[in-house]
């Protein structure tokens, strides 16, 4: 039998070099070459391979126990009370301790479920604390109840006012004929959004009638319609239709006053939308005419200390102590003398008659650098009175997700800002906006969507107000006060002001303290772990280490199961492979002969004794014994030999 040896290994062996340090370039005299010291990279790679080999052998071997042996070992070595008694006592006590262990395990799991569910409910507890320190005075926004001066916008509302007067005549005297009076009216606005009368006496067949009937088309209204409108059960509504007129909705009102006011505001909004905002600012009340006197603490102030903004419903509004460009003003003491005092002229004689039905000042207290939603959160101060407002400060600190759906700055609220795509003028001039807005406003689903989408602020400051009023000025001092104010504003010796146009405000801190209402987690992670550990220790005398032991036994069970499944798959594969061969497996002699038959000569068929040998027949070599497996011929690095031996020992 021939023995094949790699020449490279033989060459290295003859020259006395171990095969793992033999130079690859053949330069044996290189000074940089160091005997017996492999490179750092090769050494690190060898250690990693050895570590992975050990881990692979350990995974293949498994825990080395059966299921029963693992259970017995766990019960005998665990620190949990109960399992050890199951394997150490007699049959009756084993059964008793087994049932007790199951019962207490179920109790622990039940208690754990209650505590985890309570923790995941994200309940909060509220604490109230009172503090004393110098506080920032709130920002004060004031607006006139009338957005514009009627003398400056009268030319814009000429057609609308004439149509409004005709509507009032129809409501007050419907039995009179107004055919001649309505022929000169501009019905272009009316035809798109008219006021109608709805007869609801028959709820199954309600009748809808135009307030003007067919007069604006040159015809007279029937007497039957007049009788219906005079009867009880006839309500006024505003018809809102889409741009193509295919879809219409009716907004009902219980009073004609509400109906005509809302209709007039809607039409006026469309008219004002066609006017540039700068012109609208000039048509509203300027600060130097509205703010007659100002005093904050002991320091005088004027309209220049206010920031002007334009609000669509109230025109020019003025904000004191907004803090956008300057530092917020503090207040160190409570009382009227340390607050803000204002005397305002609302100019009630120049109010728009159909647009502003309330006379007075709309005001709101809010935080610095926050936009005032004065239409929703503001209050009115009546003209001819001195209104004193005492302020109490409440600071609210809510917890965010997952305890409450609050927002810090509103950036995460998923609401599309239409002002980034369309400007305000374009949106209002679209004739279809009223119908769309009315549908959304009356939609219950849309309200629920808004409630779920809009979030309250996590940190908020609320100003609780105590309001008191008194007549101002009194009849005894009315003459000289109005003389002085008229001279200061108009440099006139005559009185240009009246009681119905004057408002005096006093805004101050009622108490020198503030309340902080703060939310905190009612059940935090410390509470949860304490209760879980307490229940586990009380019922079973266990701890976290006992849970780790239980997790270890579960991992061993899974490990053994995987090894058994792999072994089963291998055995099935071997059975399929053996089933594909019909004959018996080859013997050792046949395998040796296959390795020594280098000529690959076919076996000879049996011949009769009369036939002679073939002429070219050659005698086959007699098979010898296989060569011994000498360890000296296994030319491998010593590190590899060590790793193999250690892997076998794992």
UniProtKB/Swiss-Prot annotation:
Locations of Acidic residues compositional bias?
Answer: 641-650
Give the transmembrane ranges: 96-116, 543-563
Please list the residue ranges that the record places on the Cytoplasmic side of the membrane. Answer: 1-95, 564-650
User: Which keywords are on file for this protein?
Assistant: Cell membrane, Cytoplasmic vesicle, Disulfide bond, Glycoprotein, Ion channel, Ion transport, Membrane, Phosphoprotein, Sodium, Sodium channel, Sodium transport, Transmembrane, Transmembrane helix, Transport, Ubl conjugation
Q: Any one cellular component term from GO for this entry?
A: cytoplasmic vesicle membrane
What membrane topology was assigned to this protein in its record? Multi-pass membrane protein
Instruction: Reproduce the UniProt comment on modification after translation.
Output: Ubiquitinated. Can be ubiquitinated at multiple sites and undergo monoubiquitination and polyubiquitination. Ubiquitination by NEDD4 or NEDD4L inhibits the ENaC channel through endocytosis, intracellular retention and degradation of its individual subunits. However, some studies could not confirm the ubiquitination of this subunit of the ENaC.
Q: Where is this region: Disordered?
A: 600-650
- Please list the GO biological process terms of this entry: sodium ion transmembrane transport
Q: Which residues lie on this side of the membrane: Extracellular?
A: 117-542
Q: Where is the signal peptide?
A: none
Molecular functions (GO terms): ligand-gated sodium channel activity
Instruction: Provide the glycosylation site positions.
Output: 244, 305
| UniProt key word Glycoprotein | yes
List the Pfam families.
Answer: ASC (PF00858)
Q: PANTHER family per the record? A: AMILORIDE-SENSITIVE SODIUM CHANNEL SUBUNIT BETA, AMILORIDE-SENSITIVE SODIUM CHANNEL-RELATED
Query: What family does the entry list?
Result: Belongs to the amiloride-sensitive sodium channel (TC 1.A.6) family. SCNN1B subfamily.
Its quaternary organisation is: Component of the heterotrimeric epithelial sodium channel (ENaC) composed of an alpha/SCNN1A, a beta/SCNN1B and a gamma/SCNN1G subunit. An additional delta/SCNN1D subunit can replace the alpha/SCNN1A subunit to form an alternative channel with specific properties. Interacts with WWP1 (via WW domains). Interacts with WWP2 (via WW domains); inhibits the channel. Interacts with the full-length immature form of PCSK9 (pro-PCSK9). Interacts (N-glycosylated) with BPIFA1; the interaction is direct and inhibits the proteolytic processing of SCNN1A and SCNN1G and the activation of ENaC.
Protein name (record): Epithelial sodium channel subunit beta
Identify the species of origin: Pan troglodytes (Chimpanzee)
């Amino acid at each position: 039998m021939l023995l094949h040896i790699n020449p490279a290994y033989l060459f290295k062996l003859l020259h006395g070099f171990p095969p793992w340090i033999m130079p690859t370039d053949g330069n044996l005299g290189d000074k940089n070459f160091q005997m017996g010291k492999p490179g750092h990279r090769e050494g690190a790679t060898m250690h990693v391979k050895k570590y992975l080999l050990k881990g692979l052998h350990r995974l293949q071997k498994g825990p080395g126990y059966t299921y029963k042996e693992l259970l017995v070992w766990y019960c005998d070595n665990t620190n949990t009370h109960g399992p050890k008694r199951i394997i150490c006592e007699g049959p009756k006590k084993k059964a008793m301790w087994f049932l007790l262990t199951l019962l207490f395990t179920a109790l622990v799991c039940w208690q754990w479920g209650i505590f985890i569910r309570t923790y995941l409910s994200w309940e909060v507890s509220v604490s109230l604390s009172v503090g004393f320190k110098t506080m920032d005075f709130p920002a004060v926004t004031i607006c006139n109840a009338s957005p514009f001066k009627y003398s400056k916008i009268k030319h814009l509302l000429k057609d609308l006012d004439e149509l409004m007067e005709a509507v009032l005549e129809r409501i007050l005297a419907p039995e009179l004929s107004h055919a001649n009076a309505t022929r000169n009216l501009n019905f272009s606005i009316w035809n798109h959004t008219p006021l109608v009368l709805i007869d609801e006496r028959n709820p199954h067949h309600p009748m809808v009638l135009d307030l003007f009937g067919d007069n604006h088309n040159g015809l007279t209204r029937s007497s039957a319609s007049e009788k219906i409108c005079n009867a009880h059960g006839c309500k006024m509504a505003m018809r809102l239709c889409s741009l193509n007129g295919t879809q219409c909705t009716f907004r009902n009102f219980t009073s004609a006053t509400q109906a005509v006011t809302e209709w007039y505001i809607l039409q006026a909004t469309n008219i004002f939308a066609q006017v540039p905002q700068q012109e609208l600012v000039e048509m509203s009340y300027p600060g130097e005419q509205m703010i007659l006197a100002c005093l904050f603490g002991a320091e005088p102030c004027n309209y220049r200390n206010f920031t002007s903004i334009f609000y669509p419903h109230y025109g020019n509004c003025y904000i004191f102590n907004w803090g956008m460009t300057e530092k917020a003003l503090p207040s160190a003491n409570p009382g009227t003398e340390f607050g803000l005092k204002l005397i305002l002229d609302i100019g009630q004689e120049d109010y728009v008659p159909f647009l502003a039905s309330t006379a007075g000042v709309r005001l709101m207290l809010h935080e610095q650098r926050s936009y005032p939603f004065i239409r929703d959160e503001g209050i009115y101060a009546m003209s001819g009175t001195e209104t004193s407002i005492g302020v109490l400060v409440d600071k609210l600190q809510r917890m965010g997700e997952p305890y409450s759906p609050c927002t810090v700055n509103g950036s995460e609220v998923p609401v599309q800002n239409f002002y980034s795509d369309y400007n305000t003028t374009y949106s209002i001039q679209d004739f279809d906006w009223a119908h769309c807005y009315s549908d959304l406003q009356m939609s219950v689903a849309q309200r629920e969507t808004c409630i779920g989408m809009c979030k309250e602020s996590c940190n908020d400051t609320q100003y609780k107000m105590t309001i008191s009023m008194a007549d101002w000025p009194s009849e005894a001092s009315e003459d000289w006060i109005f003389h002085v104010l008229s001279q200061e504003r108009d440099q006139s010796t005559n009185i240009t002001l009246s009681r119905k146009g004057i408002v005096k405000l006093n805004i101050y801190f009622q108490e020198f303290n503030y309340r902080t209402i703060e939310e905190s987690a009612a059940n935090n992670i410390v509470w949860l772990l304490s209760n879980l550990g307490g229940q586990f220790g009380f019922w079973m005398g266990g701890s976290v280490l006992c849970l780790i032991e239980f997790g270890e036994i579960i991992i061993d069970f899974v490990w053994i199961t995987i090894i058994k499944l792999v072994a089963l798959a291998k055995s099935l594969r071997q059975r399929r492979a053996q089933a594909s061969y019909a004959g018996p497996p080859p013997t050792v002699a046949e395998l040796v002969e296959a390795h020594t038959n280098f000529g690959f000569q076919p076996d000879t068929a049996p011949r009769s004794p009369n036939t002679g040998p073939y002429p070219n027949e050659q005698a086959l070599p007699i098979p010898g014994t296989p060569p011994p497996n000498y360890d000296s011929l296994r030319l491998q690095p010593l590190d590899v030999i060590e790793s193999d031996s250690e892997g076998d020992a794992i």
